[in-house]
Amino acid sequence: MALTKADIAEHLFEKLGINKKDAKDLVEAFFEEIRSALEKGEQIKLSGFGNFDLRDKKERPGRNPKTGEDIPISARRVVTFRPGQKLKTRVEVGTSKAK
């Protein structure tokens, strides 16, 4: 199951008691700040959670899997996520409990 923005807004409504529209607006504003910072080339550091970074990938050779034709894969910038140690620990502990 996936956690959606609507799910996050619902949790804010239930746990903090803010109305649903404000919760939805808060979630949208949070993600818009992240998008905006990444568009500007900034790193995002969420303490206890992890970091979102931008990485430039160079052009590289590729191959069309259907035809076998060589095609270049263009250079691009990608977003990467590196989980923080606290998140890694919680996931590892949660995984061992689930077994």
From Swiss-Prot:
Pfam family, one: Bac_DNA_binding
Gene Ontology terms for molecular function: DNA binding; structural constituent of chromatin
Family annotation (Gene3D superfamilies): IHF-like DNA-binding proteins
GO cellular component, one term: cytosol
Annotated InterPro entries: Hist_DNA-bd, Histone-like_DNA-bd_CS, IHF-like_DNA-bd_dom_sf, IHF_alpha
PROSITE patterns per the UniProt record, alphabetical: HISTONE_LIKE
One GO term of the biological process aspect: DNA recombination
Keywords: DNA recombination, DNA-binding, Transcription, Transcription regulation, Translation regulation
Cysteine pairings via disulfide bonds: none
UniProt key word Transcription: yes
Lineage: superkingdom: Bacteria
Function: This protein is one of the two subunits of integration host factor, a specific DNA-binding protein that functions in genetic recombination as well as in transcriptional and translational control.
HAMAP family (UniProt xref): IHF_alpha (MF_00380)
Family to which the UniProt record says this protein belongs: Belongs to the bacterial histone-like protein family.
Subunit structure as annotated in this protein's UniProt entry: Heterodimer of an alpha and a beta chain.
Protein name (record): Integration host factor subunit alpha
Native source organism of the sequence: Pseudoalteromonas translucida (strain TAC 125)
Origin organism lineage: Bacteria, Pseudomonadati, Pseudomonadota, Gammaproteobacteria, Alteromonadales
Gene name as annotated: ihfA
